Amino acid sequence: MTNRDIVWHEASITKEEYQQKNKHKSSILWLTGLSGSGKSTIANAAARELFEQGYQVIVLDGDNIRHGLNKDLGFSDDDRKENIRRIGEVAKLFVQQGTIVITAFISPFREDRDQVRELVAEGEFNEIYVKCDLDICEKRDPKGLYKKARNGEIPFFTGIDSPYEEPKAPELVLDSGKCEREECTGRLVDFVKNSLA
């Protein structure tokens, strides 16, 4: 069997029907930024708040995805690209089911984030840059990863010996180095209410 033999199966419930029932649009909120910038913390806090207000929402977190779906991938540039490609495809499926998908991935390469944007309709991908200076992320270092990277124990670590390409025109910037978690979370929730309601 080849890819030509595989046919896309149309669902019996359309994205528009899901959105009508959910009373909100579906979208990917792609949180990107350095390790320790607060992506997962903000994503989960916003998801909780949105869920309590009746939104259909799911968080796809980089560490959690690497425990299952992407556990076969390392951290080379090619593996990072494949990691983002796979999660982009998963996020697209949730968007088709009327869900707001909040992702929390370093996703260091602009090209990879742009490829995910191309998977969904215009306006269904929102790049959220969780901005935080490297020195602040290193001071936070909640998982001890920066220390290990500085000691040479973790190769290809973003921000240390592998580059991070900042978004050029994100839909929203959350400066977690200057704002408290609650303020960043509130701004993300407000963004959803203003653009997806």
Curated annotation (Swiss-Prot):
Residues reported in the UniProt entry to bind ATP: 33-40
Descriptive protein name: Adenylyl-sulfate kinase
Pathway: Sulfur metabolism; hydrogen sulfide biosynthesis; sulfite from sulfate: step 2/3
Annotated organism of origin: Bacillus velezensis (strain DSM 23117 / BGSC 10A6 / LMG 26770 / FZB42)
Any coiled-coil regions, as ranges: none
Similarity remark: Belongs to the APS kinase family.
EC number(s) on file: 2.7.1.25
Catalytic center residues: 107
